[in-house]
């Protein structure tokens, strides 16, 4: 399936992508989706804005197998420099800037995640939950377990930066052995 077949109109709304955004083979975008500068949507991710809008802001990345959807009452807004891990589900929620959403985490309708926070792998952010800025949120159902240190918070955008470099390599056709440097992992 080529890119034109994976970028689908719905109800007279079409996805819009910044010229330097990257959409990997197998990813699908439907309806009122806006993908910002240097943002990326990776293999087998589904971004479906059939009932409301989805905004993926600059330098954010939606990793392999993630699902982004909306509800009648809420769109989904993903801030700048956000990393949405493999298999995560974001449904009708708001994610602040420089947030790391761990692999297989779920964020439900009306939830808001404050900037510079980490949603741990497999965490469940229930509907309407407000996660304060700078929080480490773990568990299912999840809860804030502690505040992130200033050093941990400042390192979160580096994960998104890695994906900006990686998507540029894919766009430029750089050989498979390319590997941008890994950011340091924040302590949990």
Language-model features, listed with the residues they occupy:
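N-terminal segments that cap or nucleate solenoid repeat domains
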Residues: 2-41
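Glycine-rich hexapeptide-repeat left-handed beta-helix
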Residues: 1-17, 50-58, 64-66, 70, ...
């Amino acid at each position: 399936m080529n890119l034109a077949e994976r970028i689908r109109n719905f109800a007279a709304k079409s996805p819009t992508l910044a010229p330097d955004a990257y959409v990997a083979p197998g990813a699908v975008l439907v309806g009122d989706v806006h993908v910002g500068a240097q943002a990326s949507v990776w293999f087998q991710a589904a971004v479906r804005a059939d009932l409301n809008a989805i905004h993926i802001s600059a330098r954010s990345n939606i990793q392999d197998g993630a699902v982004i959807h909306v509800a009648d009452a809420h769109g989904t807004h993903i801030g700048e420099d956000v990393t949405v891990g493999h298999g995560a589900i974001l449904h009708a929620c708001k994610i602040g800037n420089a947030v790391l959403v761990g692999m297989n985490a779920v964020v439900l309708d009306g939830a808001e995640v404050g900037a510079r926070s980490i949603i741990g792998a497999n965490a469940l952010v229930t509907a309407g939950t407000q996660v304060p800025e700078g929080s480490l949120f773990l568990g299912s159902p999840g809860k804030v377990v502690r505040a992130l240190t200033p050093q941990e918070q400042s390192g979160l955008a580096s994960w998104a930066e890695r994906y900006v470099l990686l998507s540029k390599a894919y766009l430029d056709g750089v050989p498979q052995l390319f590997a941008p440097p890994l950011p340091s992992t924040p302590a949990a």
